[in-house]
Amino acid sequence: MRESLVAILVTVISVLGAIHQVKSHEDQPLSGIAVHKITFGLNEKAYVKASPTVLGSNGQHSELVLVQYSSPKPSDDDWIGVFSPADFNASTCPGDNKMVQPPRLCSAPVKFQYANFSNPRYTNTGTGSLKLQLINQRSDFSFALFSGGLLNPKLVAISNKVAFENPNAPVYPRLALGKEWDEMTVTWTSGYGLNLAEPVVEWGVKGGERKLSPAGTLTFARNSMCGAPARTVGWRDPGYIHTAFLKELWPNSKYTYRVGHRLSNGALIWSKEYQFKSSPFPGQNSVQQVVIFGDMGKAEVDGSSEYNDFQRASLNTTKQLIKDLKKTDAVFHIGDICYANGYLSQWDQFIAQIEPIASTVPYMIASGNHERVWPNSGSFYEGLDSGGECGVPAETMFYVPAQNRAKVWYSSDYGMFRFCVADTEHDWREGTEQYNFIEHCLASVDRQKQPWLIFLAHRVLGYSSTYFYAEEGSFAEPMGRESLQKLWQKYKVDIAIYGHAHNYERTCPVYQSVCTSHEKSNYKAPLNGTIHIVAGGGGAGLAEFSDLQPNWSLFRDYDYGFLKLTAIDHSNLLFEYKKSSDGRVHDSFTISKDYRDILACAVDSCPATTLAS
């Protein structure tokens, strides 16, 4: 037994010892563990014990584990690392993880916490305990005690194994709008490959007959990643991602569903039951409420993984969205989704965090730099922001109604809204495939039925006075407005919303950097320009504004928050900015217009005419 434990410990050291050789983006807490100075310090008087050993006995997919530990030489910088899979065997490491010299790497810790977190007297007593939340991630777990802090860790002891009763169970369903207005998609994750079970959804109108619909299955392998850490230290098997298409839905109706798998012996494994409300018919005159934000990320409710506080506010945003869920019809998370940055275990933790939201209302995404950017991968920008993911996890974990899911631009109709979602990680300039899509999306909407035309993108293509855009001198992505403002103006886009800059900012209705209205809160059409919003305060660390506040910048807030658009009817729209800390409205405006206002000419918004015409 002891020889086996020592072998595991030695291999854990190998795992950690290689992490320093691959640098991830500084935003990822796990990348802060500088373990290149690690030493082996197994101590017979030290121990780590975890209980219960079997989780999810009542069907739950997250559970608190009590971790008790003791060290004969305690220190304030001792910490507990959580590992999954629990065993670390160097013989299982893939070939492309060979290091110049031993040790070799298998996988990174899932999360960590300091040993004195719940016991300030840890250095006196040498004992402590933590309650750590684990989620079902398709494998078992173990817990390791380290001394020496994050910068000079010494492995002291490792625990028994802990596992969920059914690690393959279907978990974390997430809804998305389909390509047709009467279609809803449901995506979930499991450990069941097609060789083990067939994925199915049981669904129907609430209180009515239910039917079974099949689901497609996707996954991806390590060699689908573009670089480290996603391809090396951060790699973790994503399991299987299943998507079913629920079609011919009645408008504005409540449906119930559950996801599951039919095993080879005919037995069915089911999730718990969920419900959603289907979309209204395009143009249907009913109150419709949509939430929009970017750059949220994830955080641990047990306080772990806190090398920094970069995304702690994401829990506040999530909490407020859940609190207001009954008054929300759809959510758009416009890029920088979970900041996994190549540590793939974080994707499971993110979809678990948003499950109460995404299982109830459509959770639509846009592509951000932290999902897509990687050198020589076809992204519009160069950089290491995705940690080697190059878009693959995001494009697989979440369904979007795009023609090509590797090019995350698409249109979505919800009642009186038309959303045109751009992909700023691919070229959007005039003459490109995406530019043609954007124009088609804006031009093809019937504004008599869907008067509210909203443009969404991750990077700021319009206006922002965030310091890094001010330093560019463009107050936006270079080439952003240059290519697109004539489309916004021509097709009378009401509001354009972006993330990327981690703050909140609202402009006046603006065209070519000039305000086209001096009103600030109650707009009456025609606006003769587009209102631009930065909503990048979903939860990731905030970004400062420049000292200069341009004339077009009406409202700036250095805080976390999200937007809510309410289409009251075809003539009235309410815009609200709510803070994540309290859920209260801190900025708002209304737009009132009639169909004739959309038809009327404004500067550069009508076809050219001649004397002959």
Curated annotation (Swiss-Prot):
- Cofactor binding comment, as recorded: Binds 1 Fe cation per subunit.
Q: Which domain of life is it from?
A: Eukaryota
- What does the record say about tissue specificity? Expressed in roots, stems, leaves, flowers and siliques.
Compartment(s): Secreted
Looking at the UniProt entry, the stretches that span the membrane are none
Checking Pfam families in the record gives: fn3_PAP, Metallophos, Metallophos_C, Pur_ac_phosph_N
Disulfide bonds, which pairs? Answer: none
Spell out the subunit comment: Homodimer.
* Name of the protein: Probable inactive purple acid phosphatase 1
Organism annotation = Arabidopsis thaliana
Q: Which gene encodes it?
A: PAP1
